[in-house]
UniProtKB/Swiss-Prot annotation:
This is ATP-dependent DNA helicase uvsW. A motif (DEAH box) lies at residues 232-235. GO terms for molecular function: ATP binding; DNA binding; helicase activity; hydrolase activity. Its cofactor is Mg(2+). It holds the Pfam family UvsW_N. Coiled coil: none annotated. Keywords: ATP-binding, DNA-binding, Helicase, Hydrolase, Isomerase, Late protein, Nucleotide-binding. Residues 122-280 form the Helicase ATP-binding domain. Plays important roles in recombination-dependent DNA repair and the reorganization of stalled replication forks during viral DNA synthesis. Active on in vivo-derived T4 DNA; viral DNA is highly modified by hydroxymethylation and glucosylation of cytosine residues. Helps process Holliday junction (HJ) intermediates to mature products by catalyzing branch migration. Probably able to catalyze replication fork regression. Unwinds HJ and Y-branched but not linear double-stranded (ds)DNA; unwinding requires ATP and Mg(2+).
Amino acid sequence: MDIKVHFHDFSHVRIDCEESTFHELRDFFSFEADGYRFNPRFRYGNWDGRIRLLDYNRLLPFGLVGQIKKFCDNFGYKAWIDPQINEKEELSRKDFDEWLSKLEIYSGNKRIEPHWYQKDAVFEGLVNRRRILNLPTSAGKSLIQALLARYYLENYEGKILIIVPTTALTTQMADDFVDYRLFSHAMIKKIGGGASKDDKYKNDAPVVVGTWQTVVKQPKEWFSQFGMMMNDECHLATGKSISSIISGLNNCMFKFGLSGSLRDGKANIMQYVGMFGEIFKPVTTSKLMEDGQVTELKINSIFLRYPDEFTTKLKGKTYQEEIKIITGLSKRNKWIAKLAIKLAQKDENAFVMFKHVSHGKAIFDLIKNEYDKVYYVSGEVDTETRNIMKTLAENGKGIIIVASYGVFSTGISVKNLHHVVLAHGVKSKIIVLQTIGRVLRKHGSKTIATVWDLIDSAGVKPKSANTKKKYVHLNYLLKHGIDRIQRYADEKFNYVMKTVNL
C-alpha cells in the first residue's frame, strides 16, 4: 500500500508513506493564502504565501481524509485508511425521527416543530460526527445547535463547547437554548465578556458558551473535558487561533461548524473542511423565501452618479483615498440621512450600515438634527447598551439605528427590521450576505424586507462619442457594487437598479 492513514486523535490523522510521496502530498495540501501579496512576510521574502495543511510531523487535519482519495485517483496511488477514522454514529433516520418527535420544543409560549432542513442538518451532523452545516442566515442555526447538544448529552458523557464570534452572541445563544426549553439556565455556563456573576458557580454545567478570543486563552488541559464542539458563524474561523483550539480538542469526537456564508478561495474551504469535515447545504435563501420561512426580499441597487468633473479628479486615487473622499461627501451623507428619515416616517425600522466610525457619526449627527428616534452602535458601545438598543428596535416603530458592519452583520438578530441601507459599499461576500440575513427574519409588521445598496458610480466617461464603452475607467466602489449585483444574481435575489444623480 502506497499511503497508510492512521488515526492519531480526533483532530488529526497521521500519514505513513515514502518521503517522495510525502512531499507530493504536502504540495497537494498547500494553497495560496488570501491576500498573501500584501503580507509583509511575503514582501520581505520570509514566506512564499502558501498555507500547508500537512505538517512535517506528517499530521493532517482530520476532516481532509476524504481528499486523500482524490490525491490517489489523480496520481495513481493506493491508500489504506484506518477503519477508526470512518466510524459513524449508529443512528437510523427512523430512530432519529422518533427521538425528535418526543422532544417538546418551544419558541416563547408556542410549541414548534423543526423545519425539514433543520432536521436534515442535525441528522447529517450526528451520523457523520462532524460537518460544516452551511445554512442561510434566518434558517434557525441556534435550534440546530440546541438539538445536536441535546442528543449528545442524552447519549454521551462529556461537555459541549460552543464558540461564538461576539460577546452579544454568547448571551443570545444561551437565551435561545433556554427559550426552546431544551436546556435550563443552570445547564449553560457563559465565559468571557458575555458571562454574568452566576456563571462563576456553574462549573458542572454541561454546556459552555464563549467567544474564540476567550476560549483560545484557556490552558490545554481545559479542552479535554469536551466531547462535542460547535463553532457558530465558522466563516470567521480561519487563522491560527481557531486552529489551535481545534488541535486542543483532540478528545472531541463531534465537531461542527455552522455558517450562512463561507469564504471563497480553496485555502479557506480546505481549512474549514480540515477542522469540521465536509460541507452540507440542505437549503438556499431563495428556497426559504419560496417556502415562506423568511421574509420576501427586495434589493434596490442605487447607482449614485457623480459629476464628470468629480470622476476625473477621483481617477488614480488609491482604494483608501477613494473611500475617504466619498464617505466624506456632505451631499452623499445628507442623501443617506434623508432616505433613512423617509423610511422611518412610515413607522418602519431601518439600519444604516457604516464601516468607519467618522462616517457613522457624520450620518448619525445629520439624522439627529432632523429626527429623534435614532441610535448609534459601533464596537465602542458596550454589549449591554447594544442589547438595550436591540430591545428598542424589536418593540418600537420608526426607529433608525446607525450601526457598524462589525457589530451588526454577524449574528445579532432583530426581527422587527424593515430596511437596511448599505451606506458603505463593502466588497466582502460574507459581510453582504450576513447583513442581508439580518433583515430577512419574519415579523408580523412586515411582508417585504428591503436592502438599499448604494453603489458609488464615479466611472470616467470616454472623450469620444463613437466608443461603445460606457466608461473608460471604473472606480473601486463601482467595481465592488457590480460584484455585489453578481452575487445577488447568483443567490437568485430579487434586485432592481436605479440611478440617482448627486
